[in-house]
């Protein structure tokens, strides 16, 4: 028997580890995972009842969840519709002829939830949590971290190969020719390699104090002169911001002017096309849902996708997780129990 002082982990967990099994559609197991699995089983069983019209909660938001869940679970309908809902979106992006044309539509794309390469968001100010301010992030990279892009990182090359293979299969499903697929992916990977030189690594991102870089709006707009930030935000907000916090300062000061430019348009357009072909995959056929998860499963070491039932539940749950969480709390943590905890 392992002694505590020799190997604390195995002394405590050794017997459990011998029989523990990681489910094929999960990346891990353990105490917290077991609890999550129990909650998942409860929610799947409960929502099955709701779909069948049984024990439906008297809550308008949850009733809307049930309606949406019924749609996500209707795989016959999803198969019949196929990729038709996404075709107009793909054609719209194919027809974009220049960066200036794209830039003139960024506000429209942002407000309609379409791909837009516009990495802005609103969050509390580090210096005053009562105040929400504008933050300028950076476009995301393909690999998990900038360290995967070094020449000697074999895992990065392996993952990029898996990503490319997945995208080749997806683009073929959307009717792109082999020549078009190669051209698009070559351009996307080229832009991604450039971008990885300027975005923050995971280690840098964890240094929260170092991420606070406030800019006056007039100074910030000069960092990407071809990006019409004033007109974009005026269309979205009705005014221009006073200031912006820039955690991804290296991207904005050293690369944004090139990234958001006519000279970079062909590479950026390829990236937008990829986004247009993937943004709604989870809502379409089951084949596309599973295929689109291939790269994510490689990252997490999960060998198997969720089955249809879980896929439909989590797709619907993602939009109603707060309402479902409150329902669960009400079922499992009564007001009396809450008061008892608060009193101790």
Language-model-detected regions and their locations in the chain:
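Active-site-surrounding "flap" and adjacent substrate/cofactor-binding loops of secreted or lumenal enzymes
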Residues: 3-7, 11-77
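Noncatalytic, helix-rich "gating/capping" subdomain that lines the substrate-entry/channel surface
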Residues: 48-344
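Extracellular/periplasmic catalytic domains that process cell-envelope and extracellular macromolecules
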Residues: 1-4, 126-128
